[in-house]
From Swiss-Prot:
Site label Binds to alpha-7/CHRNA7 AChR, positions: 28, 35
Intrachain disulfide bonds: 3-20, 14-41, 26-30, 45-56, 57-62
Site description Binds to both neuronal alpha-7/CHRNA7 and Torpedo AChRs, may be important for inhibition of GABA(A) receptors, residues in chain: 36
Protein name: Alpha-cobratoxin
Entry's Gene Ontology molecular function annotations: acetylcholine receptor inhibitor activity; ion channel regulator activity; toxin activity
Record function comment: Monomer: binds with high affinity to muscular (alpha-1-beta-1-gamma-delta/CHRNA1-CHRNB1-CHRNG-CHRND) nAChR (tested on Torpedo californica, Kd=0.2-4.5 nM) and neuronal alpha-7/CHRNA7 nicotinic acetylcholine receptors (Kd=13-105 nM). Also inhibits GABA(A) channels.
Matching Gene3D superfamilies: CD59
Record-level GO cellular component terms: extracellular region
Miscellaneous notes: Negative results: the monomeric form has no effect on alpha-3/beta-2 (CHRNA3/CHRNB2) nAChR. It does not show any blockade of the nicotine-evoked release of dopamine and does not affect ACh release. Does not inhibit the homopentameric alpha-1 glycine receptor (GLRA1), when tested at 40 uM. Exists in two forms, due to cis-trans isomerization at 6-Thr-Pro-7. In the dimeric form, the Pro-7 is extended away from the toxin core whereas in the monomeric form, Pro-7 makes a turn.
Compartments (UniProt record): Secreted
Amino acid sequence: IRCFITPDITSKDCPNGHVCYTKTWCDAFCSIRGKRVDLGCAATCPTVKTGVDIQCCSTDNCNPFPTRKRP
């Protein structure tokens, strides 16, 4: 499977059986810059924690960098 990986946001091969993920969360600059984003691949979908959104998928390049909605 191929997944987008941060910080370069490039598509890279991940080991067999892995899933792609997109993890987003707010930090001190969230209202100005938007949510922080981490893209990658993992053996299993990362555990969800309070304040962190995680989406996992299992097709090539299914985790593109999310677009920020403009007001």
